[in-house]
Design a protein with these regions (language model features):
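N-terminal Rossmann-like or analogous alpha/beta NTP/dinucleotide-binding catalytic cores
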Residues: 2-149
Length: 149
């Protein structure tokens, strides 16, 4: 900006703003500080792989990844952890699947239901990997886990 009476704006990326707020909160809470010193910062999200995952779910993953990266850029030990809630039970057969085949799995955890496509360990594994296999294309760095393990 010119010096003709205009103020120079100091604008931070939203992920950096959130990272700064998290760091400040941790620094001001002795219990949190002690925990984070042992474990690092965890940015956590969870998805139930109940069928085709809506693209809107990706918004959360992009946000969480950006916050974890902002924390790391500030020298913090941080990681984004995405958990598949595959221990959750099937409560509705998706309309695009054969009801006769999958209705018998009502109430069964997604990790224990056969995949609709060969090559996957379970229903939950198939639908979770439909998205997470694309993370590299979007630059998302996540540690993947399963609630069923």
């Amino acid at each position: 900006m010119s010096s003709m009476g205009k103020k120079e704006l100091n604008v931070k990326h939203w992920a950096d703003q959130i990272a700064d707020e998290v760091i400040e909160r941790v620094e001001n809470d002795p219990r949190l500080k002690k925990l984070v010193e042992k474990t690092g910062y965890f940015v956590y999200d969870e998805k139930t792989p109940s069928g085709i995952i809506h693209i809107g779910s990706g918004r959360g993953w992009i946000i969480h990844d950006a916050i974890a990266k902002a924390l790391r850029n500030k020298g913090k030990n941080a990681k984004f952890v995405l958990s598949s809630d595959d221990h959750d039970p099937l409560d509705k057969v998706p309309s695009y699947l054969d009801k006769e085949i999958y209705e018998k799995y009502m109430g069964v955890p997604f990790k224990d239901i056969p995949s609709p496509v060969e090559g996957y360990s379970s229903f939950g594994d198939y639908y979770f990997k439909q998205c997470t296999d694309l993370f590299d294309q979007f630059g998302i760095e996540a540690e993947l886990e399963s609630t069923g393990e």
